[in-house]
Amino acid sequence: MSENEVVGSPTTNGDKNEDGYPAENGEGTNVDDNNNEEEKDGIPLDNDNDENDSSEESATDEEAERQVREGFIVEDEEDEVPQEIRRKKKRKKHAESTADQDMLDEEDLELVMENTGQGSRFSKLRRLKRGRDQEETLENIFSEEEEEEENEVDDEAPNRTQGHRAGVIDEFADFIEQDEFEDEERQEEKYETGPPIESVRPEALGISDDDYIQIYEVFGDGTDYAFALEDEDAEDELEESVSLKTIFEPSELKDKMLTEEDEIIRITDEPERMQLYMKRNIDCSEDEFREQVAWIIDYLLKNRRDIDAELYEPFQTAVRYVVHFFIRDSLEVPFIWQHRRDYIVHNNRERNTITPLLSQNDLWNIFFLCTKFWSLHSKKQDILKLYSDLGINDDLVVPFCEAASSLDAIDDLNDYIHFTYSEQIRDRALLMGTGLRRPQGSKYSFFEKFRKSSLYNLVKEFGMSAKDFSFNVAQGARLRFVEDNTLSPEELSRTYVTNELSSPEQVLQKARRVLAEEIIHDPQFRKSFRDKLYNAGVVTVLATQKGVRKIGSEHPYYEFKYLKRKPLGSFELEPILFLKMLKAEEEGLIQLSIEFEDPDDVFKGLLELFVSDNFSENAMQWNAQRELVLKEVFKRFSALAPDAIRETLRSRYLDELGMRCRNQLFSRLDQAPYEPSTKNFDRGTIPSVLAVSNGKGESSDAIICVFVDDVGEPTDSLKLADLRDLANQAMFAEFVEKVKPDVIGVSGMSVSAHKIRQHVQDSLTSHEPVDLIMVNDEVARLYQNSTRAVDEFPTLPTISCYCVALARYVQNPLFEYAAMGRDLMSLSFDPWQHLLPPDVLWKYLETALVDISSLVGIDINEAVTNKYEANILPYIAGLGPRKADYVLKKIAATGGRIDNRSDLISKQIMSRKVFINCSSFFIIPNDEYPNMDILDSTRIHNEDYELARKMASDALELDEEDIEELETNRGVVYHLLEENETGKLDELVLEEYADQLEREFHQKKRNTLEKIRLELKDPYGEQRNVFHKLTPSEIFLMLTGENPEELQADAIVPVNVRRVTNRFVAVKLDCGIDGNIKADEVSDDFIPPPQLLQVGQTVEGVIISLDEANFMVDLSLRNSVLQSANSKRQTSSHRTSYWDTEAEKRDTERMQAETQAEQRVARVIKHPLFKDLNASQAEAYLSKMQVGDLVIRPSSKGSDHIVVTWKVAEGSYQHIDVLELEKENEFTIGQKLLVKGRFEKMTYQYSDLDELIVLHIKAIAKKIDEMCIHDKFRKGTQAETEKWLESYSEANPKRSCYAFCFDHQHPGYFILCFKASVNSPVTAWPVKVIPNAFFLQGNVYGDMTALCNGFKLLYAARTKNFRRM
């Protein structure tokens, strides 16, 4: 079935609402309206007004907890607790001990409250202190003592963290014996603290309200003595019961979908996938809805170039309808595709044509775009709220925010507000009570101070503000003009000279800096600059030192290793290439740069919008100042803009990669059961299958034959040693005659499987014809060793389970793929799918399962008892793994079956919205049950049942009396089908009927009417594509693992010699296929093959031709052919017009020189740690050794150098160059060994190798160990450390933070990452480990304490200097 297939013409169902959208939400069903109401959680009323009532106590507890959170604790509140309650609480101590196990302890609760932004519970209870200065000393900015000081608590203050729940502990409590009514009191407390008992209505008892009240006053509510009727064993069970949280780890609860969030998803009346993947606002305003539609349309049109101009308006209307279905009606993609198709096609009545507007892929794109929009929208609302709270008036903020269409633009606006109004934001934070004192200065303190000073007037005298210039850039024209000052820049700046700024140039420098910063933070400028860079940008790749060595000509990254100035826009056609480049950059193999193709031209264009047209000397001087400002802006933002572009492209291209994987899986799922050519089966009939395989194809492997019947169960099997034996062939033929399969499927895990196929065919030459096919075994390979196979067939051997999976794949590919669940991600859908995060990949794969599962439908009653069929239930529209499990359990609890679809509502198995989405995909066969509805066995939705009955009665030309009579006897539709009168449906003129429905009821139903006709003629007929038979290329790839395209002519491959004769040489390739080399292709000198080759030898050969079907290849070993193939590969490999040939040549020559240097006479040094290895070999040698181990090896720099390579950490090795002085000769070790520290500009001298090892290597290793055990060290990468700092800073906005991590690019170095405030960026300083010390910013520190303190002092000093500027 094609994804874009559209059956019939456009139509619709349901009246339009006030907004012009169809009110099609299932209200035409044959379900009782009373049963369509959503269940509401009732709140039972308890008439017991006793002061000790547990509900009152619970309310008190909740109030106490709320007060704890808010910090408003009354000192003497505990003294007001009645004495009776205290006594009861002492009695409850034993009962509460079990409940307390589920509660967080003090430290955990403290951490949770801090991380959720509620602050410490104890922070409000600290003793009063002297007021601090408004600005703390900079030395304390990263102080660890601050936290301890802030968490001090009055020693005499009672611990009130538990509120009333803690109670008062009697000092003599341990000495008081429990009285004999302890059990009774526990029972009393059980009823007090347990769930409220639902009240009984008087009318249900047949008495009046007054009588009920009188009875209640005399006898109570019946719970006072209920404990006496309680079974003690049951009570013990209750006391011993524990929550799931005490049984399972949180990760296990999440995997088993038993968390509270899972339960919410399970019971909420919304499709499960919408709750998981779609962030939306059902109650959004019409303005918000229109904004969302416009944003999605704009996004889609940027990527759709196949829409004609005349279809733009219908396309936009179709998108508007789809968004409405998602947001307002909670309809999933399969429902829209099946039952709202009329809204996503264009019906041209004049031309009588129907044009599809949206495909299933488009529907899923819109589905995910809804989430992206609401993420954008929520950020917009946050910005507008901040703007409103600040009480400022800025004509840029609101218009820019409303027009922003990307998260980048919103981030730009956020940066602009925090830069421009940083002081107001800090004042707002103070007023909101987020801190005890005025927050310290931010990174914008200098600009705040500058804007308040008179010097800011000089910035205004530049003649054009940052806003005006950015407006010109955004418009691409000079619409706002410069006004030159009558004084020259130097003359005007003299008036601002002070003691700190002693010259006009210093004054101008400060003014230029401020103006440049204002331009850089202007969101209009940022957006326009990024747009220019995207449209006129080029990409250049520079291989790192690691990349030069690692990326060889056969490496998958070589295609872009020397890429130079490739237009950025060209990657729209090669999105995967860009993703591969980003991945290579993450691995440290390349550096990716995005820059303007002609930066000078772009700069001139921007400058034209910023300068004056006047030609006076004064104007020229001011223009020169403006040019200096723009140079700084251009330089700074040229470095910042590429990051946003690459992340935007990464997100977009990952979506495209996800869609590629989805489409691949969709095509594999879209296969009907195999249709045997020798049988007259209806489409969709399940065949019986005989699966044959020899497993891995090794000589010891037997041939296994497993027969699987048409219900998917293995019923017979046969094991043969060798099918080449005629006796075994006869046994196989007898077995086939016995089980009589509809089709025989062969597969295996080696090339020998294709020979098994030939042997099977030979065995059946005298047998009546049976289809013989090769079967895709990608599912079977995973199934054979899975826990699912063990659970289903615990006694079957692995290879037999493999055969069962092969047979089932032939019977129904969908069921086999669906049964895999998330293991589907182990299959290959795209060579680069590993670039997708697992959750994102699964999200896209799931969409394919949902589409095909909903197309095929599910026999819901069969699914209750058949787990194999139930595997597709989670992928039915409206459901998911949680709701599917819930539905099966509810059906099992209500008799194990449902008689009709309406039972899903009437028996409260599912709620209304879920029912609307999934009901038509539930098949209920037309069995002989009185409550059966024959339409429940079709794809017709309940809302269209009346239309189906109307069409059936019109086809049979029945009057009302006839219809009434037939409806009392199974109905009109049943009569139409039983009497085989469905041919009369073709006589109906559906177009006229559809026009009438649209004209009178505003319902588009043309496609729906056609679908009803098809379903009445063939209920739930097979609509998938025919079973896909593997092509020779696909069989070749499956059995060899090699793509045939990679084994074409001129490919160079290693081959192993198996047989040598004077006429030919038989070889085998690594992939398992056989090769043949003619005698004249062995050498150019026509030397007989036996004189050159011997069995077992491995040589390089050139492929001449490949026979895919027979798994044979012809090769040549001639030197001339090898040289020609090498030359072709080098000239054609990855060459493009954007290739840096000079860099490639330079690196090649350097690598060759290093190779030659390594191949010189090997140097031998008498030392146990010396090895004759190169750099990569040394790393490989140390990879299996302990951290700190080392080797001494020769150096490529000459005989007066050696290299010490040592293992810094797992995967990290430092190569230390050692210069030898005072050598006796070329081969002896020098008497002086020097290690030059370039970074710290120090030279270390040693007398021999052992001294160097102990005093240098081991001393460094000891310091690295000291760093790694420090509490400020983090094991992750720099990016992970920075992310952690960001998260920590958000959770602790009043604190500065820092951490150390490995510098993976420079072994032997660490990176000090720090974040001074929540609004400041993360800054990184390099820290080098030197013998017995750490080196930071030109200073040497002996230990970690000194390093941390030194860092704080350095930062404080720099900040002070920065403020003076």
UniProtKB/Swiss-Prot annotation:
Residues 1050-1118 form the S1 motif domain. This is Transcription elongation factor spt6. Residues 24-33 have a biased composition (Low complexity). The modification Phosphoserine is found at residues 143, 454. Belongs to the SPT6 family. Transmembrane segments: none annotated. Residues 47-64, 73-82, 102-111, 136-156 have a biased composition (Acidic residues). It is found in: Nucleus; Chromosome. Keywords: Chromosome, Nucleus, Phosphoprotein, SH2 domain, Transcription. SUPFAM superfamilies: Nucleic acid-binding proteins (SSF50249), Ribonuclease H-like (SSF53098), RuvA domain 2-like (SSF47781), SH2 domain (SSF55550), Tex N-terminal region-like (SSF158832). Residues 1-14, 1124-1139 have a biased composition (Polar residues). Residues 1-165, 181-202, 1124-1146 are annotated as: Disordered. Residues 1167-1262 form the SH2 domain.
